[in-house]
Structure formats: C-alpha cells, structure tokens
Amino acid sequence: GVLVVHEWWGQNEYARRRARMLAELGYTALAVDMYGDGKVVDNPTDAGKLAAEVSMNMPMAKTRFEAGMQYLLNHETVDANEIAAFGYCFGGGVVLNMARIGENLKGVASFHGGLDTDHPAKPWKIKARIISFSGDADPMIGADKVAAFRKEMEGAGANYRVVIYPGAKHAFSNPEADELGKKFNLPIAYNAEADKDSWEQAKVFLREVFAAK
C-alpha cells in the first residue's frame, strides 16, 4: 500500500491523480487528508496557514498520518509491513518527518518537499528507505538545506538517496505549477523532464523497497 500526502493546497485532484497513478501500477493507494474535513484552498495565504498548523504540530501530524495509514491497513489487499509513502511539496516534508520519527514504513519518497525539520532523526530511528527529489533552482530548499539533510541522514544511519535536477524549480512535478506561479507570483514551475524522471525512479524505488525483506 502507498499513502500519498498532498501539496499545501490540500487533498485536491492533483493528489488524487497521483494516487490513481499508483493504483494503475497495481498498488493500493490512498490520498491522505492532512488538513481534515477535506479542506482545499486556492491561494497561498490560506495554504500557508493550513500547512503551518500541521508542520508546527507534530502530534497532530502524526495522528492524522497514522489515521490514513490505519485506513489503508484495513483494506484486505494491504500487508501491515508493506506500506510506503509519497509526498509532494508540503507532503514531502510530512512523509520525511514520519520517517524521522520511526513510522513503520518500507519507503518514503519526497517530491520537492522541504528537507529541514524541527524533529531531526535520532540514530537508527528511521525504518524507511528514503529518496528525495529536488530541483537546484528551488529557493525553498537550497544547497545548504540539502547538505544539512545529507548530514542528518548520515548521522541517523539512514538508507537514503537525494536526486537533484538542474534548473528545476519548486513544484516541478505539478503541471499546474506554471499557471499558479504566474497567478500568485510564486517561484514555482513545472518541469516535464524532472517530473518524468522522478516518477520513473520512484517506480523502481517502490519495487525495490517492497521486494526487500
């Protein structure tokens, strides 16, 4: 089973489409609602507020993520020890934090998700294999944060990999990023090459983590 955690806009059609793409590959996938009550917003001000409420409240984030995980586990096709999580933007930061605190996940894939955290991983706490996809033109991440993330993962003894796409900006996997960037003057943009490559690598990643015993 695979959990999909949405961007800061909420559990919208994009997040559900990503879950459907995973289902088409044969996985049981669930688009998690980290905001509650199906909240979906259409502007950065509201999105930032909702994202901050979750990001700054780890107990709440953990509870909501685990509720989604339990719902997925209740499905007859899902093995309790065979769960992975994909996260996009805000959701990328969420799934990385869930890995940091030791959730029972086989793998975590973060797509243009934040790498910094207020909850750094303790040595040998992380159970999940981790892969992070970022663009080197993403001002929300930056080389310093990538370096700090690598150091954190090394110190935690994590099995991780960081993939950096030259020229790719924040939200590179979302085809609507160009329009949203222009509308709200945000430093985001779709990058078809990075989108395709990260998805192909993520598919291989899932096959590998679910094959590992």
Segments and roles (model prediction):
Residues R18, G142-M153:
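Short alpha-helix in the alpha/beta-hydrolase fold that links the catalytic acid
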Residues K125-I130, A156-N159:
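Short, proline-enriched alpha-helix->beta-strand connector loops that line the catalytic pocket
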Residues G1-T77, P175-A189:
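Serine-hydrolase catalytic machinery in alpha/beta-hydrolase-like enzymes
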Residues M34-G38, G114, A168:
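Short beta-to-alpha linker loops that shape the active-site pocket of alpha/beta-hydrolase fold enzymes
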Residues F65-K127:
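Primarily recognizes the serine-hydrolase "nucleophile elbow" in alpha/beta-hydrolase
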Residues E154-K213:
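C-terminal catalytic histidine-bearing segment of alpha/beta-hydrolase fold enzymes
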Residues A137-I141, H170-A171:
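Acidic catalytic loop of the alpha/beta-hydrolase fold
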Residues S132-S134:
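Short beta-strand/loop motif that positions the catalytic acidic residue
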